[in-house]
Curated annotation (Swiss-Prot):
Pfam families: tRNA-synt_2, tRNA_anti-codon. One of its GO terms (cellular component) is cytoplasm. One of its GO terms (molecular function) is asparagine-tRNA ligase activity. It is found in: Cytoplasm. The gene is asnS. The keyword Secreted does not apply. Keywords: Aminoacyl-tRNA synthetase, ATP-binding, Cytoplasm, Ligase, Nucleotide-binding, Protein biosynthesis. Its EC number is 6.1.1.22. The lineage of its organism: Bacteria, Bacillati, Mycoplasmatota, Mollicutes, Mycoplasmataceae. It comes from the Bacteria. This is Asparagine--tRNA ligase. It catalyses: tRNA(Asn) + L-asparagine + ATP = L-asparaginyl-tRNA(Asn) + AMP + diphosphate + H(+).
Amino acid sequence: MEIKQVFEQNSELIDQEIELIARVRSNRQGKFVSFMILNDGTTFTDLQVVYKTKTKGYEQALQARVSSIVKVIGRVVLTPEKQQKFEVQADAIELIDQAIEDYPLQKKEHTTEYLREIAHLRAKTKTFNAIFKIRSAAAYAIHKFFNDRGFVYIHSPIITSNDAEGAGEAFLVTTREDADYEKDFFAKKASLTVSGQLHAEAFAQAFKKVYTFGPTFRAENSNTAKHAAEFWMIEPEVAFADLKDNIQLIQDMVKYIINYIFKHNRRELEFCNEHLEDGLIDKLNSVRNSEFKVTTYTEAIEILKQAVANGHKFEVSDIEFGLDLGTEHERYICEQVNKAPTFVTNYPKEIKAFYMKQNEDNKTVAAVDLLVPGIGELVGGSQREDNYEKLIKRCKEVNIDIDQLEWYNNLRLYGYYKSAGFGLGFERLIMYITGASNIRDVIPFPRTPKNLLF
């Protein structure tokens, strides 16, 4: 029997004999009774097993070290006077596999820095068990959200010849030691994808509502708490949709995911609130229960200018139209001014991607970023440029290889009305939901500069 089943069926199992196999989290010998705390990975909550000298295998059980595997046969009994509602009184304990004495994860607290060095073991700790349970649940919630709304899930390619962001920070894919791409596997320069958006946009023209959810890669030599070389992106795309539709979809999705975690992972959330970020649950409640605000980029610039005039200190205090807002500016807007998650719209075209729809003022594009208290930008999206001539002109302005993107640009020639979508960095979302302060702690095996240990 799994420990999760014991907790789910505890009232039906009272005084019933059960058998389970689990891992030892702690083992303490007492004068008259001894206590073993077990978990088999099926639930966040540990199960207490009580055993005595008359328990079959008693001497063997006493020797069970942390992380050893045991088989327990015993009865479920109520313990209303204790912290837990019930426990298992063991009739027999078998030590199936003994962990080594210097097992790296002992009962003492370990730093996250140390645990990153043993990423193959850290999921056994309470902290990372909670984080990765929430990550799993959030991934399921994303698929459920889009599936319930009629979206088609597509698998965009991992290997591509396109750089959707135009930043040139892609990992090259090659079978050669030289740079002769014509003789390479694909007979051209290839790289790992930085975004599935362009391919999603093509499929949206066939299915109307699509989304990708998969790994993306950036060869950005940045050793910060927010950057990783490999991460996951959620990228929906909706044909015949504009920026207003996009904003509504973002708000609905973010609230849905948080609500799902509250419903299905409350225990893990409470642990994160206690151990990772004090006030986490209040923060998430404010997001899921509030109406998101909308502010234009131009309005945001004026707000920031006024803040500087009133004496507020920003690290970057030269606030002018064209500034690429930093985290400090984003957090000021949503935390100090709007006091709510905030959509900032209509950014200058010079600081946004080539494929975004140009507004009538010829200065801004129909872009949107969702800013949330605590971290700043969480989601970035836009309505896409639907005018072929404008798109080609913009590609030339920013030195995008038109021939390389011919297939994408030509979508506008085959019946193209509107399209809008966004990208949400999955790890950044998990950081926000769990209170984890470093992206390395929300990815099972993080890939960062100078780090490829596993």
